[in-house]
């Protein structure tokens, strides 16, 4: 498939690995692997809602913290995790840009935020009840340590806009186990108990 200028257009690929099936350090009583200093730092930032100052978290972790804070403040109508906990949606772009972004990011325009999502490999869903939401297989509700595996992509050569993705290839999140918040106590040492709360499989659109 070519662009209007005759350049080859890259098609969005939706290969998805269920990272929730991978035991995350510090979330189960059966996993005795000690936390690294980096992992401890991530959990500290996540638990204390550290978003600014020295040692500010990278974009994926900051987004995890943002979603947690916004939920605690009762502003899920602006931005939130979707019911399955595997993607998030921006429901009110105007309010997100003017009331949320300035608190968490240096950028002031939603287009800049979307560019960051693209640079970190987030993919936009193009169909179904979650149309317009973003996901990354290592970006899951209550699993901040997985964000360590989200790497910023280096763009080389000609920049071409990806073609629309094929709906039939997009992950079927509502057919996967729903992910609830995980209690990650400050100072957990790898012997923390998994307190994930089961989620009701309510098939509802966060964009309705």
Task: Describe the role of every protein-language-model region.
Residues 1-208:
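Extended low-complexity, intrinsically disordered regulatory tracts
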């Amino acid at each position: 498939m070519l662009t209007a200028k005759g350049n080859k257009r890259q098609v969005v690929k939706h290969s998805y690995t269920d990272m929730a099936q991978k035991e995350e350090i510090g979330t189960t009583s059966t996993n005795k692997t000690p936390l690294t200093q980096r992992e401890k730092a991530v959990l500290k930032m996540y638990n204390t809602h550290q978003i600014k100052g020295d040692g500010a978290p990278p974009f994926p972790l900051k987004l995890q913290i943002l979603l947690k804070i916004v939920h605690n403040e009762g502003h899920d109508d602006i931005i939130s995790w979707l019911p399955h906990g595997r993607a998030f949606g921006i429901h009110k772009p105007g309010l997100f840009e003017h009331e949320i972004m300035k608190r968490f990011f240096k950028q002031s325009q939603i287009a800049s935020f979307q560019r960051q999502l693209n640079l970190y490999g987030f993919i936009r869903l193009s169909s179904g009840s979650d149309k317009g939401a973003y996901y990354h297989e290592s970006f899951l509700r209550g699993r901040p340590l997985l964000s360590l595996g989200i790497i910023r992509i280096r763009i080389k050569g000609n920049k071409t806009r990806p073609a629309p993705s094929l709906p039939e290839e997009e992950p079927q999140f509502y057919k996967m186990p729903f992910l609830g918040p995980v209690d990650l106590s400050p100072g957990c040492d790898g012997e923390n108990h998994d307190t994930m709360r089961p989620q009701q499989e309510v098939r509802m659109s966060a964009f309705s």
